[in-house]
Amino acid sequence: MKTLYSPRRYYPVETLFNGTLSVGGRDQETTGFAWWAGNARLINLSGKLLGAHVAHAGLIVFWAGAMNLFEVAHFVPEKPMYEQGLILLPHLASLGWGVGPGGEVIDTFPYFVSGVLHVISSAVLGFGGVYHAIIGPETLEESFPFFGYVWKDKNKMTTILGIHLVLLGFGALLLVAKAVWFGGVYDTWAPGGGDVRVITNPTYDPSIIFGYLLKSPFGGEGWITSVDNMEDIIGGHIWIGFICIFGGIWHIVTKPFAWARRAFVWSGEAYLSYSLGAISAMGFIACCFVWFNNTAYPSEFYGPTGPEASQAQAFTFLVRDQRLGANIGSAQGPTGLGKYLMRSPTGEIIFGGETMRFWDLRAPWLEPLRGPNGLDLSKLKKDIQPWQERRSAEYMTHAPLGSLNSVGGVATEINAVNYVSPRSWLSTSHFVLGFFFFVAHLWHAGRARAAAAGFEKGIERETEPVLFMSPLD
């Protein structure tokens, strides 16, 4: 009978190595998987699978620490982070470490400490991974039943899910603790151009927090990506932290309901597919967040958003031409619309020119110049501060765009300056990885469903035409 994990279910392709290559004492004949299938050989060996996962965690943490130290070693304090291709230091700076007013780096030692701690942690994880992969028991069920499991044990699986949720909840609350009790976080909206600030009054109101989830993802609504203040971000982490903790406790103390037992496929590959689907969704959300949001991802560290760079260019030339004597309130552009200022369809005063498409941008360097009806003409004439001019000029020349023509009026010839914005890197990489993880989700979900239904889709090797053809030589 072809049971769920029987090697006979897989009809392996015959290769040169099938009978000869054995990795770690496990070959294709005994496991049903070739050497390159990696952890699939360990599906029913909980001890060895633990070793693989711990070692993998060690590799991840080692990358984080080593890359962190690499960025610290190459960091130039006089240049903005986004001009130096940094992707880790901006995250640490956003947490309020090592920075002061305006996002200026005043101390790199916390970044060094972070890198060293990660490298040391990776050594501990690496040792644990090697131990469990080579020395530790192959299965945990006999020696350590609390850590052992069988994939089909629905109650054990939801208990493991619950433990993960509790840990995630505490992780969310760590950010809350940093923001509220341990020195605060960097707030790009702090008066005068951003500063590290203790969040003393996080948002608890569920109508505000869950209102983001009920927003449209399109246009100016922006779903959760539209969050524009640190109080809501920290309040959201308070809510999600406790939801994860209480949800985790629920999954630990309860057994799956009948409808859940019927609805889900309960196998290792099914859990893999669920996880890949969840990570894919997180990747797509992260892509949008880092591309559009300048509160969670402050422009001082990650560079301006696309709309922000475009609006910054319009603002920079408005400042220049106003100094040269232009009347910014009445000057016409080549299309007959306002050259510097115009009205949006709903009546607000906005920047003119190509940047009109980004009229609903909100940025800390621009908001002080708004009035009750959009940009305030009198403020633009009298109240522009030097820091606003400097910042907009900097953002104008560091758009997160690579295009042969202009986008939103910003000159973006990619060969002109050796610069790629961290926003471009982070959003593109998360979109691409999110897509690949989604494909992997579909792949493993299809295999898991097929296995649960008692068949395996694939080529029937026994009647494959190539087997009846004469050898090439």
UniProtKB/Swiss-Prot annotation:
InterPro entries: PS_antenna-like, PS_II_antenna-like_sf, PSII_PsbC, PSII_PsbC_sf. The modification Phosphothreonine is found at T15. [CaMn4O5] cluster binds at E367. Coiled coil: none annotated. Keywords: Acetylation, Chlorophyll, Chloroplast, Chromophore, Manganese, Membrane, Metal-binding, Phosphoprotein, Photosynthesis, Photosystem II, Plastid, Thylakoid, Transmembrane, Transmembrane helix. One of its GO terms (molecular function) is chlorophyll binding. It is a multi-pass membrane protein. Belongs to the PsbB/PsbC family. PsbC subfamily. This is Photosystem II CP43 reaction center protein. It comes from Chaetosphaeridium globosum. The gene is psbC.
